[in-house]
Amino acid sequence: VARLRDIHVDAEHVGRVTQICEKMPSPLPLPMRLWHLRRRRDAFGFALRALMFDDPISDDEAAEALGADLVSRLVEVGLLTRRAQGRLASPFHLGLIGSGFLFSDDLQQVEDGVMGSGRTTRGLCAAGVPTRHVDSALDLGCGAGAVAIALSERATRVVATDVNPRAIELARFNAALNGIANIDFRLGDLFEPVAEEAFDVIVSQPPFISRPPDTRPQTWLHGGERGDELPRRLLSALVPRLRESGRAVIMVEWPEVDNEPLEQRVGDALGADSSAARVLLLKAERTRVDEHCTAYAFGLRREPSPEFASTATLWRDHFERMGVQTLQLTLNVIERGLPAWKASVEVRPLGASQLKASHIDHLVATRGLLAAGRDALLGSTLRVPEGASFLEVASGRVRVTFADVLEPIEITKGAAALVANVHEAATVRDAIEALAPTLGVPLDEGREKALDGVRQAVTFGVLLSLP
């Protein structure tokens, strides 16, 4: 770890490499990234080629990158292996999680391997790691341990579970690699390893990819025939595993079927426990199944192959039979506590924003005000999100653009004026009392009209409560 940091294998420098062709699906960017790395001829380039990009290097290059003694030890423990002409590369994939390092399997080479840290996992860590220190946290389905390692900085005790024994072994190794000692690794399916325990925080990215008939199941990938069977099973047992006011952040790409509202599907999965839960669905990118099938069929292989077209077609036929046309990537935020409520918010694609736990804190607190009732809303202090801008785009219409994670929206000029007044007032009640007489209707009617406008602004994220 010290050597990797010495040669600048960190988020900033590795990010400059992964930005190359970053909008292209894996593995299309690989040739261009390697082209740039091979031109560097320095320790950083050699290390990334051997440890991150499966591009064998010579003994001299390995020694320059890592030092001869360390290379010998890595070969001895199997983190570097000999390839053609005796060149060296890792059979694993080295990734980054925060300031730490994470070894995972090359999923194209290892049968039912262990997933590491990709774009969605990094987004899940940013959203799921709490803003305050907590006593206990659970990484459910830990894979190589990325989320557990991130949680270990904010939790006194972390439990990490997985149904795959190889995942537990690799995650335990990664924790030791990063000098982390407060993670308890347990083998088992979903909540079985934690029995009757409850946690302050639960974070999970369960497998949610659909599995067509007659295809080989992969533990890290498939969530069932439709893809959401495993996530729904997880949600059905979730709330009792949370402490009072505990929060779960569960990432799922939900197949959209028969125009069934996502709020209803999540509520049905939670069952009777939904009456004791606050549910906030953060809807990120929506993907058409044509793109989904193409990306996954191609991404499971290092390069185009004769099986690519047949695999993509098999997946597409499967979705057609189920009536699925789109998939919705969603961060499902569930808190245990009253009053119970459900809400959903459109957010930017995870690759275009960094949705953090602090954003979720604000959104949950604000929606909680609506559920708490009229008096709570009137007595609250609401503010426009930091960095939001208001631009008149048409007669009577104003476009609101957010600096963080929410999608832009349009509101009326009257609504924008109301928002500005609430933003400047000590409380919502003060703003309404000042505005109501100017609305040209009886005073009580004006108060209700203004309060309804505040509710709408809160619903769309134009006004937020400070948690």
Segments the model singles out, each with a brief description of its role:
Residues 43-91, 125, 129, 138, ...:
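Long, charge-rich, low-complexity alpha-helical segments
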Residues 1-46, 86, 110, 339-420, ...:
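Acidic, low-complexity/disordered tracts enriched in E/D and polar residues
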Residues 82-131:
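Class I SAM-dependent transferase core
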Residues 164, 227-283:
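Conserved Class I SAM-dependent methyltransferase catalytic core
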Residues 118-204, 210, 255:
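Conserved SAM/SAH cofactor-binding pocket of Class I
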Residues 165-166, 204-233:
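Mobile active-site "lid"/loop adjacent to the S-adenosyl-L-methionine
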